[in-house]
Amino acid sequence: MWEYAIFIIAYLLGAIPFAYWAGRYKGMDVRKHGSGNIGTTNAFRLLGAKLGVLVLLGDALKGALAAYLGYRFFGPWGGIIAGLLAMAGHSWNPFFGFKPSGKGVASGFGIILVLMPKITVMAIVLFVLVVFLTRYVSVGSVLAALTVGILVFLFNEPMAYKVFAVIAVSGVVIRHRTNIQRVLKGTENKFNLKR
């Protein structure tokens, strides 16, 4: 029975605010600067490459660990449920009043890296290419997420992964809707990496 505690652990893993901690290390509250998100992109923009990479790794790791634990004890459905809980913990952080706090992209990549590594590599390559060409992280994130959603069905992955793709991709697109509107208006901030 105790193994069901993994799902609580997954949610709490997702809530670990790496970007917030990194900002505090630099004497900054990232919630009050940039996009206000405690996520990877805001960390890169505000804190520079070194801390940004650490936040990226931390955010991806919490998704990966949650998915691994869920899969280890409950198979594909467990991996997906635990992964989605980690994304929820990141995106609506309980330590900050459940307000929208991140978009869950890095955590999502951690999840699919564990459960669908081949698809992850393809999505990451597309993400890097799109961001390099457009300088829009939001466009790269949305297109990479949509790619995951398509490839899960093309590769006929287990039903659990298809359900995850529909939910997670929808979540990523919805959380980026204001970014998409700004891209269309030409007012979205382009990604310029601080050193």
From Swiss-Prot:
InterPro entries linked to this entry: G3P_acylTferase_PlsY (IPR003811)
GO CC annotation terms, alphabetical: plasma membrane
Transmembrane region(s): 1-21, 51-71, 78-98, 111-131, 136-156, 159-176
EC number: 2.3.1.275
Subcellular location: Cell membrane
Chief location: membrane
Keywords: Cell membrane, Lipid biosynthesis, Lipid metabolism, Membrane, Phospholipid biosynthesis, Phospholipid metabolism, Transferase, Transmembrane, Transmembrane helix
SMART domains assigned: G3P_acyltransf (SM01207)
A Pfam short name: G3P_acyltransf
Gene Ontology biological-process entries: phospholipid biosynthetic process
Pathway per the UniProt entry: Lipid metabolism; phospholipid metabolism
Molecular functions (GO terms): acyl-phosphate glycerol-3-phosphate acyltransferase activity
Topology relative to the membrane: Multi-pass membrane protein
Catalysis: reaction(s): an acyl phosphate + sn-glycerol 3-phosphate = a 1-acyl-sn-glycero-3-phosphate + phosphate
Source taxon at top rank: Bacteria
The protein's assembly and partners: Probably interacts with PlsX.
Family membership noted in the UniProt record: Belongs to the PlsY family.
Functional summary from the UniProt entry: Catalyzes the transfer of an acyl group from acyl-phosphate (acyl-PO(4)) to glycerol-3-phosphate (G3P) to form lysophosphatidic acid (LPA). This enzyme utilizes acyl-phosphate as fatty acyl donor, but not acyl-CoA or acyl-ACP.
Classification via NCBIfam families: glycerol-3-phosphate 1-O-acyltransferase PlsY (TIGR00023)
PANTHER family: GLYCEROL-3-PHOSPHATE ACYLTRANSFERASE-RELATED (PTHR30309:SF0), INNER MEMBRANE PROTEIN YGIH (PTHR30309)
Protein name: Glycerol-3-phosphate acyltransferase 2
The organism of origin for this protein: Desulfitobacterium hafniense (strain Y51)
Taxonomic lineage: Bacteria, Bacillati, Bacillota, Clostridia, Eubacteriales
